[in-house]
Every structure is written in structure tokens, then in C-alpha cells.
A protein has these predicted regions:
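A short, flexible N-terminal coil/short beta segment enriched in small residues
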Residues: 87-99, 130-134, 138-144
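Residue-level signal for alpha-helix termini/capping positions
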Residues: 32-33, 73-76, 133, 160, ...
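Short helix-to-loop capping/linker segments positioned immediately adjacent to catalytic or ligand/cofactor-binding
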Residues: 59-63, 115, 142
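Generic structural signal for well-ordered alpha-helices
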Residues: 24-28, 68, 72, 128-132, ...
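H/E-rich (His + Asp/Glu) clusters that bind or coordinate divalent metals
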Residues: 116, 122-130, 137-255
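Short charge-dense sequence patches
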Residues: 81, 102-108, 133-137, 196-200
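Active-site gating/metal-coordination segments in enzymes
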Residues: 1-110
């Protein structure tokens, strides 16, 4: 219990009924009483809100929907951060052609925009931003750099605008390790707002790769399991930045 925190999901089983909000809030309070410290991974990849590893989706309800507001406010009252997965990497919205630089993953995880009601990447990011703005007392942790690693200025702008927003780096090492100088500046500027994360299993090799990228100045190495054609380079982050992203930021938001 000294090494792990318990988090919970959301009960979306009453979606479509008038009891939807009441059920979700009551279950959230019950989980908190049982020891849950946070909520997540709450996800919207375009068709509606759901929670990872659960079968219920609130189809058509997106992160800025008024029905989500009581849930966010309850999280604020209980001091429970929300881990949010919004959209997918931008390559997954692009055509499967030679101009798609992330085709290796983009084709496998392709977002089908022909599905009725499917939200675009831009719509999803705007909806998430509105939710963060409208609930300043709720702490949001957007995983995967808000799925904006293709243009981290978007992440920086949102971090500048909303003090209740944090991001994690999970599963976005391959997308960022090709621009080490930019990333060193980005991590240093937002060192108080970034959390370490992986989302790539539990192997020692995986962790060693993330440490190599964050901590060393190694250049031009390859990680085949990351499925990208470019080489990686280390960010050589200062110790003070590493302490924050590995440990101190998490301790602060969980108080």
C-alpha cells in the first residue's frame, strides 16, 4: 500500500436514463470512501465517454457535456484527480499514404471518420479544453501529452491557460525522441506540470528505454518495438526536472 494508489473508473451503466448522473456520482463517492485516490482512465476517442476496460460507453456524451459537470465537481470536492485520454495521435486521422509520417502506427489504429457522430481531433481537443476551463477546481491529468505530440505548442498553450491541467508522457516517447533539443526546453519549461508514465507494459527493457530517453544524451539509437522509422536521441534532462516528473509532481497533486 506504500507503493501503489488505488484509482477507480466511472459507473456509466445508467447512460440514457435520468438516473445517469446520480448513479455515477454515488458510485464515485462510494469508491472514494473505499480508498480510491483518483479517477481514470476516462476516455473519449470520438464517439463518447467511456472508461478503459469497461464495456459501457456514454455514446454522444463528450467531455464538455453538461452531464459530465456534476462528475467533475464531485471529483473536485473529493480531491480526486481525473486521468483523461482524449482523441488519438494526429497521424491516425490522416490518409494512409506516403505523406503520413506516422503510418506504421497510424494505419493500425486508424480513426474511421466515416462513422456517424465521430468527432475530429480538433473537436475533441476543443471539448476537453472547455471542460478544463469550466471546472477550475478539478484537477485534470491528460495522458499521452493530450495526444498532441505532433504539435506540442498546443499542449504548452493549454498548460499556460489552465493551472488545473497536468499532462503525462505515457506511450509518447517514440513520438518525441526525434526532437531532443525541443523536448529538453519543453520539459524544463513545464517541469512542474508533467508526470512520468509508460503505458507500454512492465518489462525492464521498456523502463530502461524511457530512462535512456529522459536522462541521457545518447544519440541516434533505435527502439524497434516503438514501430517508428526514425531514430531516437536522449533529452539529457537536469536532475531537478527529473525529480519533478518522476516523483514530486505526483506527490503534490495527490495531497
Amino acid at each position: 500500500k506504500d507503493r501503489f494508489d488505488l484509482w477507480c473508473g466511472l459507473d456509466l451503466s445508467d447512460y440514457g436514463r435520468s438516473s445517469f448522473v446520480k448513479t455515477a456520482v454515488e458510485e464515485l463517492k462510494r469508491c472514494h470512501k473505499m480508498g480510491a485516490k483518483g479517477v481514470g482512465e476516462v476516455t473519449d476517442k470520438g464517439l463518447g465517454v467511456y472508461v478503459a476496460f469497461q464495456t459501457n460507453m456514454a455514446e454522444g456524451i463528450h467531455l464538455n457535456d453538461p452531464l459530465m459537470s456534476p462528475i467533475y465537481e464531485t471529483c473536485a470536492e473529493l480531491g480526486m484527480p481525473l486521468n483523461i485520454h482524449v482523441a488519438e495521435p494526429y497521424w491516425m486521422y490522416l490518409p494512409d499514404d506516403k505523406y503520413n509520417d506516422g503510418l506504421m502506427n497510424g494505419k493500425k489504429w486508424k480513426i474511421d471518420m466515416s462513422i456517424p457522430g465521430m468527432q475530429s481531433h480538433e473537436q475533441l481537443i476543443a471539448q476537453f479544453s472547455e471542460a478544463v476551463k469550466n471546472h477550475p477546481n478539478t484537477l485534470f491529468v491528460a495522458c499521452h501529452f493530450i495526444n498532441c505530440s505532433y504539435d506540442l505548442s498546443i499542449v504548452g498553450r493549454l498548460l499556460d491557460e489552465y493551472s488545473n491541467l497536468y499532462v503525462d508522457m505515457s506511450a509518447r516517447f517514440g513520438e518525441t525522441a526525434s526532437i531532443p533539443r525541443y523536448m529538453k526546453k519543453f520539459y524544463t519549461r513545464y517541469a512542474d506540470r508533467i508526470l512520468y508514465g509508460t503505458d507500454n507494459g512492465m518489462s525492464a527493457e521498456m523502463y530502461e528505454t524511457t530512462f535512456r530517453i529522459l536522462e541521457t544524451d545518447d544519440e541516434h539509437f533505435y527502439v524497434p518495438d516503438y514501430h517508428y522509422h526514425w531514430y531516437y536521441s536522449g533529452f539529457d534532462l537536469p536532475d531537478e526536472v527529473l525529480r519533478k516528473i518522476y516523483r514530486e509532481n505526483f506527490i503534490r497533486i495527490m495531497k
